[in-house]
């Protein structure tokens, strides 16, 4: 009874105390909800309205108790240990630490946790340094920086995205890899456990960190060996949306990528979803690259982008097709690879159903695709862009935007009703889409983008391309994506039908700054005429309800980004490439053919780039942000990836404030592997302890774009076998072609050449080789067209000569053998009569000739027939590799 009485007294006292506390609460604490700005959370109001700083609509938020605002809620995977100056957080394996994050990919095989193995590098201490655009905040709440540990287990796995089981690379059993979340001020401690039988690495894309942890094999570190562990440790001095991916071989294409979220100390209380977009191919990525290098057009067939002569005639573009080949160009395309699937957080269709009407959601979008650009649209409202490449930008509303490989965007979207709205990502080539659905209820689909009219793009490129392969500069301002020349191919664009209706703008009304000289139906520039193209829609204003497309000219930093005064170093790069042999370069030099570019700490480095190729390139600089010089002057946006379109000239600048070696390269994976990049090296940098032998490291780093890859074809027909085997690198090639008759009188022939390609377009190929002809039945000599005696049946001679690609893609060859005999030959292969039917022709001064047809059944098998002056008529199969 005594204990019961004591308990009743204590309960009564507690209730009285709580009641007194509630009665003395400030009025603001009793307020149940307030209105805040998503970009400026310090702006608070008791009524709806607009933000006085940026003009954005204030968002209703429930007011939390002060105690809850002072400390972030504990996370399940986090165990705190007290420390004098910092809180240490340990996580046994990486899990998405952000609310409403993506689930692990259900098709990837799970990975069992294993104890950490000894690391390959010692723990180091690094001091955070101030970076432009990432100034420390004045926090409204106390925050103790933590050391946050993640353990990443990299394993080979099996996935099924398409109905076929394929090999992939997963981190912690997930594709994409788990999102890693930190708060600005933390220290990242990431243990990478390589459980594969091959080497690996991880690059922390866009992150400012000690050079030795940048994650580029043989440039900043040794590769992580099989069945070993490597520690990446660096301070988090930024905030925003970033990502991480392998920088080893083709592992990025195979699934080794994930989101990296750096929260502000005072991150706005708004639901945020990391979205990792990616492209998936069932083919081995090494085979994809080999196919691109061998000029196999199977990917074009899959995408319906071969633009054969029959299609050109049917659609009224026969003259356009002829002019295209006269200028030695192949079919028009906007992408290199035909992908089976495009994925949103590892799914072709993802859902987040817990949102309701009025909710504003922040989408942290990462393009983790190896080579795919995505158009982003949303069915519920306009899209508000608030961040790019981890940096805040002043909010800008658009109807759509294109995101390049490796770019990140922070986007705000709102659900207007209690329905399900589609955030749609469409591949630039319009071959397929992937979606994220927000909310629940009736599905409100985003409008699909129509198929591209490639012949209109071909017509445009014909007018812009010189006969020598250069793109002729135009008499108009082309920079910062403000003039998308590809819009002539868009069915939703007025440029296709040359009308003035339904066009799209790339800037709001105040941004109409294109300088164009237009006449009635012709745009003239530097002796170069753009006939048949209405360029007006490329710079339409945002008035009259027209749709607005984002470009870099519209991005403005919220604070000044000007560099501190200092010596300036100006560099100029011409982006060059050759789709026929798939060699991509800067100034016609690959990484291995170029010296490192020396820069000094304290310099301001300005880079002026002109894209003199037919493809767009997302150029990425490791370890730095650069200013993209646009009309906003002191408020130029900060980025780490710049998408540069064909014919564009763009200028960027950055403060040289680091040490060590930093990679600058095109972020289309296959372009980078081909050699499109440079290395910036800080003078007087201390030695990298992870690379004790710099010469060996340089040799290993340069191997990538020098690799020799095989290709060839084997014909088995009724009259015999003919074929060719080629082993080629970016510059050198050795090839052997043969003809073996099934009858004795047909004999055996083979010609072997070794040579080097020269020039930006690689049309010139000097060679040496050996010619072997043998016939046991016939041994006759006759005069060739030069009046020289030629034994076509029995000869064994060394040869030297040169090949040159003529207009119409005709391969000409002049050679001389060790007996002084000359031979001139013309050959054209794979004339695209239809999407799958190819014509082959050959003739030379030895009075040899050939004509044949090949119908492509699969990537590796064709039906074929041909007539040969020596072996006569035959039909059968041709196997292509």
Task: Label the predicted regions.
Residues 723, 752-754, 800-802, 824-826, ...:
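Membrane-embedded beta-strands of outer-membrane beta-barrel proteins
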Residues 69-70, 75-77, 81-88, 96-97, ...:
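Histidine-centered copper-binding motifs that mark active-site loops
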Residues 55-65:
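Short Cys/His-rich micro-motifs in 6-15 aa windows
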Residues 37, 51:
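Short cysteine-rich clusters marking metal-coordination/redox-active sites
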Residues 851-856, 869-881:
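Outer-membrane beta-barrel "beta-signal"
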Residues 292-294, 682-744, 776, 780, ...:
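Outer-membrane beta-barrel initiation region
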Residues 708-718, 731-742, 750-752, 764-774, ...:
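Transmembrane beta-strand segments that form the barrel wall of outer-membrane beta-barrel proteins
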Residues 699, 724, 729-731, 753-760, ...:
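Outer-membrane beta-barrel proteins
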């Amino acid at each position: 009874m005594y204990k019961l009485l004591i308990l009743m007294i204590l309960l009564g006292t507690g209730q009285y105390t709580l009641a007194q506390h509630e009665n003395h609460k400030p009025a603001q604490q009793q307020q149940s909800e307030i209105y805040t700005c998503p970009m400026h959370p310090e702006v608070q109001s008791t009524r709806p309205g607009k933000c006085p700083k940026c003009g954005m609509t204030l968002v209703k938020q429930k007011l939390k108790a002060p105690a809850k605002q002072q400390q972030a809620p504990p996370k399940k995977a986090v165990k705190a240990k007290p420390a004098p100056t910092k809180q240490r957080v340990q996580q046994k394996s990486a899990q998405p630490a952000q609310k409403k994050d993506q689930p692990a990919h259900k098709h990837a095989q799970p990975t069992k946790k294993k104890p950490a193995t000894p690391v390959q590098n010692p723990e180091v201490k690094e001091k955070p340094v101030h970076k432009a655009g990432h100034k420390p905040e004045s926090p409204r709440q106390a925050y103790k920086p933590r050391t946050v540990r993640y353990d990443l287990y990299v394993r080979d796995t099996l996935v099924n995205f398409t109905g076929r089981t394929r090999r992939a690379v997963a981190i912690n059993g997930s594709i994409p890899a788990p999102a890693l979340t930190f708060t600005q001020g933390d220290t990242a401690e990431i243990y990478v456990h390589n459980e594969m039988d091959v080497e690996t690495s991880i690059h922390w894309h866009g992150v400012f960190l000690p050079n030795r942890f940048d994650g580029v094999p043989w440039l900043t570190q040794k590769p992580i060996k099989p069945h070993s562990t490597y520690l990446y440790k660096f301070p988090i001095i930024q905030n925003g949306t970033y990502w991480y991916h392998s920088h080893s071989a083709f592992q990025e294409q195979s699934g080794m990528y994930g989101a990296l979220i750096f929260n502000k100390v005072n991150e706005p209380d708004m639901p945020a979803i990391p979205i990792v977009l990616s492209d998936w191919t069932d083919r081995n990525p090494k085979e994809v690259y080999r196919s691109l290098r061998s000029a196999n057009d199977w990917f074009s067939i899959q995408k319906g982008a071969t633009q054969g002569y029959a299609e050109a005639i049917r659609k009224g573009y026969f003259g356009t097709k002829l002019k295209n080949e006269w200028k030695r160009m192949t079919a028009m395309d906007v992408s290199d690879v035909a992908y089976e699937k495009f994925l949103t957080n590892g799914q072709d269709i993802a859902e987040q159903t817990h949102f309701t009407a009025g909710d504003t959601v922040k989408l942290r979008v990462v393009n983790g695709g190896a080579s795919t650009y995505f158009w982003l649209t949303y069915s519920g409202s306009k899209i508000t862009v608030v961040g790019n490449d981890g940096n805040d930008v002043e909010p800008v509303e658009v109807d759509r935007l294109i995101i390049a490989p490796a770019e990140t965007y922070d986007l705000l979207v709102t659900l207007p009703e209690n329905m399900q709205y589609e955030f749609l990502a469409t591949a630039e080539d319009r071959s397929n889409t992937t979606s994220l659905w927000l909310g629940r209820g009736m599905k409100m689909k985003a409008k699909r983008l129509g198929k591209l009219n490639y012949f209109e793009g071909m017509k445009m490129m014909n007018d812009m391309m010189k006969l020598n392969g250069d793109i002729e500069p135009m008499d108009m301002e082309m920079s910062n994506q403000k003039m998308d020349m590809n819009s002539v191919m868009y069915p939703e664009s007025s440029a296709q039908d040359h009308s003035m209706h339904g066009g799209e703008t790339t800037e709001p009304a105040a941004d109409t700054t294109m300088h164009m000289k237009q006449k009635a139906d012709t745009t003239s520039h530097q002796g170069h005429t753009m006939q048949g193209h209405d360029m007006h829609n490329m710079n339409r204003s945002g008035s009259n309800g027209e749709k607005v497309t984002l470009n870099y000219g519209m991005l403005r930093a919220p604070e000044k980004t000007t560099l501190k005064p200092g010596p300036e170093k100006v560099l100029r790069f011409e982006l060059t490439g050759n789709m026929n042999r798939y060699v991509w370069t800067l100034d016609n030099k690959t990484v291995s053919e170029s010296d490192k570019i020396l820069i000094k700490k304290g310099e301001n480095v300005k880079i002026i780039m002109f894209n003199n190729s037919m493809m767009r390139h997302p150029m990425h600089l490791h370890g730095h942000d650069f200013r993209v010089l646009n009309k906003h002057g002191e408020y130029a946006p900060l980025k780490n990836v710049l998408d540069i379109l064909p014919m564009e000239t763009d200028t960027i600048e950055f403060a040289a404030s680091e040490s060590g070696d930093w990679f600058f390269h095109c972020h289309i994976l296959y372009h980078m592997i081909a050699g499109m990049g440079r290395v910036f090296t800080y003078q007087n940098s201390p030695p990298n302890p992870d690379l004790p032998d710099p010469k060996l490291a340089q040799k290993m780093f340069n191997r990538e774009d020098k690799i020799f890859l095989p290709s060839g074809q084997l014909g088995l027909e009724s009259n015999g076998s003919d074929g060719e085997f080629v082993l080629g690198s970016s510059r050198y090639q050795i090839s052997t072609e043969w003809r073996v008759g099934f009858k004795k009188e047909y004999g055996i022939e083979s010609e072997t050449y070794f040579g080097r390609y020269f020039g930006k377009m690689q049309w010139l190929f000097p060679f040496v080789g050996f010619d072997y002809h043998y016939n046991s039945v016939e041994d006759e000599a006759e005069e060739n067209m030069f009046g020289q005696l030629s034994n076509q049946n029995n000869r064994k001679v060394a040869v030297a000569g040169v090949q040159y690609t003529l207009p119409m893609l005709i391969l000409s060859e002049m050679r001389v053998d060790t007996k002084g005999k000359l031979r001139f030959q013309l050959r054209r292969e794979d004339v695209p009569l239809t999407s799958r039917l190819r014509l082959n022709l050959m003739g030379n001064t030895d009075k040899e000739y050939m004509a044949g047809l090949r119908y492509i059944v699969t990537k590796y098998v064709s039906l074929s027939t041909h007539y040969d002056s020596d072996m006569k008529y035959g039909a059968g199969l041709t196997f292509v590799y």
